[in-house]
C-alpha cells in the first residue's frame, strides 16, 4: 500500500492556518489540529467534511495534497498550493464539477492509484479488486527513478560488475543509445501522451499498444509542437 510518500515539509511556506479558499462556489478551509494537517471541503456526498491531509507530492512550482479514503483509495485535492506565489489555487478554475461526477476530486478523476501512480512512481502495481472496489497499490520506489525508464537494474549492475569492459547489454537494460526511435517512443510516450491504461501494469514487454490506448492528436489536446495541452 501507499507508504514512504513525502510528508508535508514544514520548511515550505504553506498556509494551514484556517484560511478559506473559494472556487466554483466550493469553500475549502485549511487548518492544523493535533499536529496534523486538515481540509474542510465538499465530499462525494455533496456535504462538507473534515479530511486529514496525509501526503503531498511536488515541491515547486506547486504542491498537491492527498487524502486517504476507505478501501485503499488515495484522492488528490483539486486545490493545490503555489509554492512560488505562496497562494492556494484551483487546478481547474474554469471547470465546475458536481460532487456526483467522476471528475470530482473524491472520485475517479483525481484518484492517485489509477490516475497518477503509473507515471509518478516506479514499478507500480495498482492491485485493484473490482468486486470490492478496493486498492492494495504497491510500488518499488515512490518517485520516478532510473528503473522507471530503464527497467529493473539488478541484472544490469551484476553484468557490468562481472564483465567490466566486456559488458554487452543482455536485453534487460532499456532505452540505450541502441534503442530504435519507434521503440523509444513506445517507452517514453506512455507517460508523455494522453492515454488510457488497460493492462494491469507496465512491464517493458510488448509495445505501447499492449498497455495503453492513446488519444488521437487534435488541437484540443495537444500544442502544435506535440506537447500536451494543459
Task: Give residue ranges: language-model regions.
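Primarily the internal scaffold of c-type cytochrome electron-transfer domains
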Residues: 1-56, 64-69, 90-102, 123-230
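N-terminal accessory interaction module
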Residues: 56-83
Amino acid at each position: 500500500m501507499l507508504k514512504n510518500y513525502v510528508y508535508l515539509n514544514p520548511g515550505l511556506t504553506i498556509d494551514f492556518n484556517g484560511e478559506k479558499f473559494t472556487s466554483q462556489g466550493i469553500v475549502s478551509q485549511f487548518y492544523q489540529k493535533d499536529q496534523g494537517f486538515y481540509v474542510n471541503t465538499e465530499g462525494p456526498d455533496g456535504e462538507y467534511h473534515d479530511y486529514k491531509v496525509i501526503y503531498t507530492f511536488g515541491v515547486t512550482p506547486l504542491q498537491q495534497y492527498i487524502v486517504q479514503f476507505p478501501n485503499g483509495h488515495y484522492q488528490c485535492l483539486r486545490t493545490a498550493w503555489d509554492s512560488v506565489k505562496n497562494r492556494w489555487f484551483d487546478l481547474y478554475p474554469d471547470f465546475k464539477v458536481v460532487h456526483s461526477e467522476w471528475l470530482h476530486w473524491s472520485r475517479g478523476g483525481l484518484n492517485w492509484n489509477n490516475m497518477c501512480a503509473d507515471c509518478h512512481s516506479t514499478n507500480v502495481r495498482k492491485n485493484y479488486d473490482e468486486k470490492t472496489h478496493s486498492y492494495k497499490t504497491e510500488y518499488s520506489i515512490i518517485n520516478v527513478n532510473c528503473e522507471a525508464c530503464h527497467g529493473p537494474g539488478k541484472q544490469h549492475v551484476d553484468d557490468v560488475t562481472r564483465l567490466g569492459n566486456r559488458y554487452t547489454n543482455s536485453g534487460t537494460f532499456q532505452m540505450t543509445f541502441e534503442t530504435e526511435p519507434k521503440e523509444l517512443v513506445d517507452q517514453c510516450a506512455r507517460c508523455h501522451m494522453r492515454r488510457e491504461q488497460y493492462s494491469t501494469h507496465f512491464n517493458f514487454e510488448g509495445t505501447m499498444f499492449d498497455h495503453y490506448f492513446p488519444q488521437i492528436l487534435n488541437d484540443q489536446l495537444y500544442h502544435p509542437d506535440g506537447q500536451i495541452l494543459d
